[in-house]
């Protein structure tokens, strides 16, 4: 057996060096440090000691005893600590002290050393006659043990003296080992001739030695060392046994790294699936399904979860969570920190609105001293024009719109681009339908109005008529005690234009308009188009910051780099400040009017945000198509205080019909639901009505009018539904239904029949059967009933049977006799009344 150090033995047996040194000392092997080596003889002694003590720890022993030469009896003896003492007292042949065992083991080892050099050791083996004598003695002693014992012997104390199963050293011969075994057997048999128990055990040693044959020692291997480790583990540091030894198991020497529970931070977005959540927590989907099941939720791995449920799961499994902010990218990119910049006063942005041919563009043309009208088809504005005008008292930015449609479109997209509205009204024409619509849009956006009464140079001009008509539309002039400035102008002669500009600048001073002139630019798209050879072209109004050529910009769902900029005069510029309209090139597509324009430092982020906005826009469009239908309108009614509001846009063929319908609908308003007609007018439903409906979440109603082609196309795009009527009462009834849809229906009981009990019969199948006469209404088999006695309800339930003569009947009418069986009730008496009723829903009415 190769030499091994104490440290190596401690490492292979997974024991501390100090504990191993104490055990070696208790076995008579003196070692002082882990570097000391163990010789083959010491290793052999160590194995003998361990195996010897190991055998004495056996708690159960089964002994086979021959009774008459043919039959055998198995004696099973179990020994516990408290029982062992009694057995030792009762049996005089039992070994008295464990120290005797140690003495015998020492004698055996001495004899092994003595006979090591002898050559004729094999002649010492006992003959067969001695073996027979021993068997007879065993049988004689075993009989009285079985006969006289006052308790059942389930285990016999056993102390194994020798069982050398050590591994050998390469230098020892097999014959020497066999000689040692046989010499030990002889010495021990002579020492215990007076003890029957040890004779039996010595017999077992002989049989085992014969089976072992001439096997020699082999080199120790890791399995045997691990077995040695298991043996050493059964002793404490003083060499005493710890407890019952089990069969030695092969111990693999390996190192298991301690692993702490990993706490993960899980990002939860709305609609996360079970499989996605499992992947983020690095667990199997079945574990999350199990947690959901314990929470009372049946789910599959592909099922979507709301954020609250996902949070509960993450916390239940010991992880942390963060909620995914869908607008995180947009907030990080679009929100600009301007805390270090100072605000400066800026020019007002003025939108000119009014009816067709009332002189909007002519007035602006005179102000700019250019001939823009000549370039427009038919003298009517086709596109939005944005112009910056310098005056002696400051600059003004004008937006010339085609009517008011673009203004509405911008408001529908949440863009607040206009500061002041100039309402142009022809003095010879007065207030027209588009004039009223312009007033409605300006008030909806809460923008101050300055009225320009145009064409006062004409002989038929009547400014007072214009003032009177506008006052009827709640546009009260300052001369009448209102807050609206009226200025008489002539776009042809230029009369009053200076006063108009002064009124606009005065209004802007009241508003105290300010903006940041530094930092990344922000603005709004006024108009956009696709030009041949230039690509997408967008007219942008800068609202904050400084827009420079080469900036990366994001406009709604479109992005790009500013490749060129032109001002309102068509000249190339390199930068533009607040309240400056510019024309830019370089976008990926044509943005929509009213889209916000922001400058982003990273072009990659701009592209990513544009794709995200496009996806959100598609989802919002699908949801909007359903929300704008009249049938679901009560689900989307806005609240003003505690009232719910139904918004309506009303268009009719004549003014009288529109006024009549308007008054009728306003009278429908109650404390719970209010009708708000946000716009009304004469003529066909136009695209401006559609954009206003989208912006205000209103329903469009047409009385004897239809929508034009442009409005139909826009309505199809935005998912707006038109409702056409030619009878006023049908229109009012439908609006009533839309308003009543929010009110929950009432449940009402209605008595449909009464039957009087004339006689009571007994039935083996139904119990008490009441012979009745229907005295009122009709008795139906399926309806609930009440039993009345002296006009007091004593039972409420259902009918079990209803018969007319011997036939089953579904109903029995007034004046006919019938047999009635009441379910689960047998105390029916003569003179009782059976009342049949039904529960109906009654819708609340306004």
From Swiss-Prot:
Its main location: cytoplasm. InterPro entries: DNA-bd_dom_put_sf, EF-G-like_DII, IF2_II, IF2_N, P-loop_NTPase, Small_GTP-bd, T_Tr_GTP-bd_dom, TF_IF2_bacterial-like. Keywords: Cytoplasm, GTP-binding, Initiation factor, Nucleotide-binding, Protein biosynthesis. Residues 454-457 are annotated as: G4. Residues 354-361 are annotated as: G1. GTP binds at residues 354-361, 400-404, 454-457. Residues 400-403 are annotated as: G3. Residues 490-492 are annotated as: G5. It is found in: Cytoplasm. Residues 379-383 are annotated as: G2. Residues 207-219 have a biased composition (Basic residues). Residues 198-219 are annotated as: Disordered. Transmembrane segments: none annotated. One of its GO terms (molecular function) is GTP binding. The keyword Nucleotide-binding applies. Residues 345-512 form the tr-type G domain. One of its GO terms (cellular component) is cytosol. NCBIfam families: IF-2, small_GTP. Belongs to the TRAFAC class translation factor GTPase superfamily. Classic translation factor GTPase family. IF-2 subfamily. One of the essential components for the initiation of protein synthesis. Protects formylmethionyl-tRNA from spontaneous hydrolysis and promotes its binding to the 30S ribosomal subunits. Also involved in the hydrolysis of GTP during the formation of the 70S ribosomal complex. This is Translation initiation factor IF-2. It comes from Francisella tularensis subsp. mediasiatica (strain FSC147). The lineage of its organism: Bacteria, Pseudomonadati, Pseudomonadota, Gammaproteobacteria, Thiotrichales. The gene is infB.
């Amino acid at each position: 057996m190769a030499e091994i150090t104490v440290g190596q033995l401690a490492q292979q047996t997974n024991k501390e060096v100090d504990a191993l040194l104490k055990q070696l000392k208790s076995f008579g092997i003196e070692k002082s440090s882990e570097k000391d080596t163990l010789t083959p003889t010491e290793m052999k002694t160590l194995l003998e000691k361990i195996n010897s003590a190991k055998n004495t720890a056996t708690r159960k022993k089964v002994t086979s005893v021959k009774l008459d030469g043919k039959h055998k009896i198995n004696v099973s003896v179990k020994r516990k600590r408290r029982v062992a003492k009694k057995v030792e007292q009762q049996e005089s042949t039992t070994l008295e002290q464990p120290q005797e065992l140690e003495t015998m083991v020492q004698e055996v080892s001495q004899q092994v050393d003595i006979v090591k050099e002898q050559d004729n050791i094999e002649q010492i083996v006992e003959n067969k006659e001695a073996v027979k004598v021993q068997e007879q003695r065993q049988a004689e002693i075993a009989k009285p043990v079985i006969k006289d014992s006052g308790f059942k012997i389930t285990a016999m104390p056993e102390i194994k003296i020798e069982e050398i199963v050590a591994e050998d050293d390469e230098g020892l011969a097999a014959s020497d080992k066999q000689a040692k075994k046989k010499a030990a057997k002889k010495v021990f048999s002579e020492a215990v001739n007076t003890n029957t128990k040890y004779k039996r055990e010595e017999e077992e040693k002989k049989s085992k030695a014969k089976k072992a044959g001439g096997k020699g020692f082999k080199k120790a291997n890791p399995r045997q060392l691990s077995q040695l480790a298991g043996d050493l583990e059964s002793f404490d540091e003083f060499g005493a046994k710890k407890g019952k030894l089990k069969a030695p198991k092969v111990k693999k020497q390996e190192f298991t790294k301690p692993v702490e529970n990993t706490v993960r931070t899980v990002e939860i977005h709305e609609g996360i699936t079970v499989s996605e959540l499992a992947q983020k927590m690095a667990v199997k989907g079945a574990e999350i399904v199990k947690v959901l099941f314990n929470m009372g939720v049946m789910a599959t791995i592909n099922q979507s979860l709301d954020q609250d449920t996902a949070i509960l799961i993450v916390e239940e499994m010991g992880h942390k969570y963060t909620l995914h902010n869908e607008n995180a990218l947009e907030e990080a990119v679009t929100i600009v920190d301007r805390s270090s910049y100072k605000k400066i006063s800026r020019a007002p942005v003025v939108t000119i609105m009014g009816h067709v041919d009332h002189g909007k563009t002519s007035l602006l043309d005179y102000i700019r001293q250019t001939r823009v009208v000549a370039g427009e088809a038919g003298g009517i504005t086709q596109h939005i024009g944005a112009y910056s005008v310098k005056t002696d008292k400051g600059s003004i930015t004008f937006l010339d719109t085609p009517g008011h449609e673009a203004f509405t479109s911008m408001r529908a997209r949440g863009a607040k681009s206009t500061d002041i509205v100039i309402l142009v009204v022809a003095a010879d024409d007065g207030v027209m339908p588009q004039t009223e619509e312009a007033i409605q849009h300006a008030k909806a956006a809460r923008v101050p109005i300055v009225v320009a009464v145009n064409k006062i140079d004409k002989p038929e001009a009547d400014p007072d008529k214009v003032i009177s008509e506008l006052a009827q539309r709640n546009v009260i002039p300052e001369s009448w005690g209102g807050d609206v400035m009226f200025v008489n102008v002539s776009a042809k002669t230029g009369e009053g234009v200076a006063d108009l500009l002064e009124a606009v600048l005065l209004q802007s001073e009241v508003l105290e308009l300010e903006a940041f002139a530094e930092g990344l630019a922000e603005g709004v798209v006024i108009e956009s188009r696709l030009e041949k050879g230039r690509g997408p072209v967008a007219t942008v109004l800068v609202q904050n910051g400084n827009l420079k050529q080469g900036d990366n910009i994001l406009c709604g769902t479109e992005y790009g780099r500013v490749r060129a900029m032109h001002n309102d005069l068509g000249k190339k510029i390199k930068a533009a400040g607040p309240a400056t309209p510019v024309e830019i090139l370089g976008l990926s597509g044509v943005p929509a009017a009213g889209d916000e324009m922001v400058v982003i430092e990273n072009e990659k982020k701009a592209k990513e945000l544009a794709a995200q906005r496009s996806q959100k826009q598609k989802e919002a469009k699908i949801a909007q198509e359903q929300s704008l239908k009249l049938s679901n309108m009560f689900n989307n009614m806005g609240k003003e205080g505690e009232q719910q509001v139904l918004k309506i846009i009303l268009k009719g063929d004549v003014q009288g019909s529109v006024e009549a319908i308007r008054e009728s609908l306003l009278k429908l308003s109650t404390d719970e639901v209010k009708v708000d007609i946000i716009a009304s007018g004469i003529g066909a439903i136009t695209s401006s009505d559609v954009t206003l409906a989208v912006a205000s979440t209103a329903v469009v109603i047409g009385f004897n009018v239809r929508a034009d082609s442009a409005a139909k196309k826009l309505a199809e795009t935005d998912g707006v539904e038109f409702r056409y009527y030619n009878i006023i009462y049908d229109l009012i009834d439908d609006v009533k239904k839309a308003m009543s849809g929010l009110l929950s229906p009432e449940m009402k009981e209605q008595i449909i029949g009464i039957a009087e009990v004339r006689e009571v019969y007994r039935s083996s199948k139904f119990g008490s059967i009441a012979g009745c006469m229907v005295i009122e209404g009709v008795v139906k088999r399926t309806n609930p009933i009440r039993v009345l006695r002296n006009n007091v309800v004593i039972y409420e339930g259902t009918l079990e049977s209803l018969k007319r003569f011997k036939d089953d009947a579904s109903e029995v009418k007034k004046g006919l006799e019938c047999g009635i069986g009441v379910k689960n009730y047998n105390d029916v008496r003569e003179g009782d009344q059976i009342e049949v009723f039904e529960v109906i829903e009654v819708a609340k009415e306004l």
